[in-house]
Amino acid sequence: MDDCSKDIINCLPDNLLCQILSNLSTKEAALTSLLSKRWRYLFALVPNLDFDVLPSLHPEVAMQDQDQTSFIDFVDRVLKLRGKDHINKFSLKCGDGIEDEDVFPWILNTLRHGVSDLSLHVSPSLVYWLPSKVFASKTLVRLKIGPKDGPRVKLRNVCLPKLKTLNLDSVVFEEGKIGFAKLLSGCPVLEELSLLNLAWDRWDSCSVSSKILKRLTLYCAHSSRNPKSVSFDTPNVVYFEYSDNIANKYPKVNFDSLVEASIGIRMTKVQKANARYVSDVDEETEMVGNATDLLMGICNVKTLYLSYDTLETLNLCCQVIPVFNNLTHLTIESHPELGWESLPNLLKSCPNLGTLVFQGLLHKATDRCGDVCMCQGLENSHSCLSSSPVKCLKILKFGETNDDDDMEIEMEQIKNFLEKMPNLEQLIIYYESSIDNDLVRVSSQLQEVPTVASLKCKIQVISDNLSLSSTLPISLSMENGFHL
């Protein structure tokens, strides 16, 4: 038997070993330098460098001076050992104690080495200016900058001709909307944009305009103000995730290619207080804002997720809910302190809805809660559910509170669905319980519910430990929509 048969790893070429080491953090890869002389500097030649010194286990413990010096020396040494070798990916995560005078040379070094994937997660305690050369790289394909309380950027000339993915967390644009517009115009092939904790509520107007963009994620920082004007001119975006205070107006909302969207628009505390006052004084609730134009711009979406804040906003800040002709999959998030007032009109506006998902069923009972639930006990009243095209109904977080009264409310709501949704073919309940008998009991109770649902309606009750499936008995199926 030759030596290579005995030691397969050591017989591999250096470039292949470097690829293997790239799957480890640089700190872990450095441990292989103890194996032999051949391995001594091999870890520094890997194309992907990952430096992580964040105190993830005990974030309250500050980095000691000795550790800081050791980390800085380690990064300096690795970059020096690489010489002029190309860097494919550079990821840096460091907390308090690592100053910008240490970080900036590392960033500039990687840019000189043609880095294509740059990820920076630096100290949240420092308010620092990011080197302008980061936004003038001809090699960057992916750029990620964070975390919360991230850097300030003053953009003069943006030139990122190859950048396809951009993720910014808490980055402050010194020139506001002008700087943001410069950034977008300097990324001619950008396909994916993610902006987290963006504070744009002080801008005169907020606009995202790109003909190339395909995925857009926008989470705006919580604020006591409403954006004055928000526009989206993104005709090729297929995925849109948006969380923000409702804007005063939406002059342009262009999502011609939209397939999937997640919307989390909310009112400010002042708007909520005004809405409660109007509700107490008048029988009819007056609008305190208007989200109609935003909804009109996304009404061709196929898959939609609405947060509980959005449900409240649609009730108080939307004059008309447009028709969602293409919508086939809708997810609704519920909150025990917020009602379902906007839900009936929303469901009536989804003529081709096939799958309806409730992320929790507990909600606030009000005298305008609508005809979707049983809050007012109107058992014989006409319900929008009676004309629902939904074939698949999913209930998430069932039994989450582990409270008997809440469980009874949830069960009554599910029974209401079965009794009124004529096209239902599948009911799936995700039960938050580790006790198998709980699932058996719920499944048995649902088998006794008179229903207008399809004769072949299948009921599934699922937990982490067990999955029960059954079909409604023919004797309990209501003919011609007659309610027992």
From Swiss-Prot:
Which species is the source of this protein?
Arabidopsis thaliana (Mouse-ear cress)
Which positions fall inside the F-box domain? 6-54
LRR repeat locations:
144-170, 172-197, 205-234, 303-334, 335-360
Query: Entry's SMART domains?
Result: FBD, FBOX
The cross-references to PANTHER family, in alphabetical order and at most eight, read: RNI-LIKE SUPERFAMILY PROTEIN (PTHR31293:SF12)
Q: What are the UniProt keywords, alphabetically?
A: Leucine-rich repeat, Repeat
Q: Which SUPFAM superfamilies match?
A: F-box domain, RNI-like
Matches recorded under InterPro entries:
F-box-like_dom_sf, F-box_AtFBL13-like, F-box_dom, FBD, FBL60-like, LRR_dom_sf, LRR_FXL15/At3g58940/PEG3-like
Question: Know the name of this protein?
Answer: F-box/LRR-repeat protein At3g59210
Q: Which domain of life is it from?
A: Eukaryota
The keyword Repeat is assigned to this record:
yes
Question: Where along the sequence do coiled-coil regions lie?
Answer: none
